[in-house]
Amino acid sequence: NYAYLTMIDKVSSWKFAEDFATEPEHIKQARFRAEQLGVETITPATGAQLAFIVSAIGAKTAVEAGTGAGVSSLWLLEGSEKLILTTIDSEPEYQNVAKQTFQEAGLDSSRVRAMSGDAHRVMANMADAAYDLVFIDAEDQDIDDHLHSASRLLRPGGVVAFAHALFRDRVPDPAIRDEATANFRSAV
């Protein structure tokens, strides 16, 4: 049965990719804090991919919508020692944990600007065409708003990246038509 074997291959491939990525100790500590808070994080392989993108495009400035405990922030910053990150989260508790994470990771405070508030509202007050990368790890109902903001914030040639872009394998399935999946599908 081809479909069954394809699914096995997919699971094996994902496991291989996830097991292949190594995570620095400071990011492991951030992941532990996120688990304690009940905050979903990106996987180590996704983090490594984000760091690669930052490096590949030579990003100097980035915006992150959805700080959480700082796991994805740290991965973005792994991509370049020159990156300046503005990270936004609506949960002050998460921001406080992330700030502690950044401090314990030894990051210079000039590299990270952590802002509390609704990401869409905060991004509305940020400079146009001033960022090389926008990473969106936010609630699914906000994806369209964040994509619109990202397109305004990005310099020509800038990159927008989404956490969970395939929305837990729902986006490729045309039979799934709920609003959240449709939002991700249109964004991708």
Set out the residue ranges of the language-model regions.
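A generic alpha-to-beta junction signature in SAM-dependent methyltransferases
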Residues: 79-80, 106, 126-127, 153-154, ...
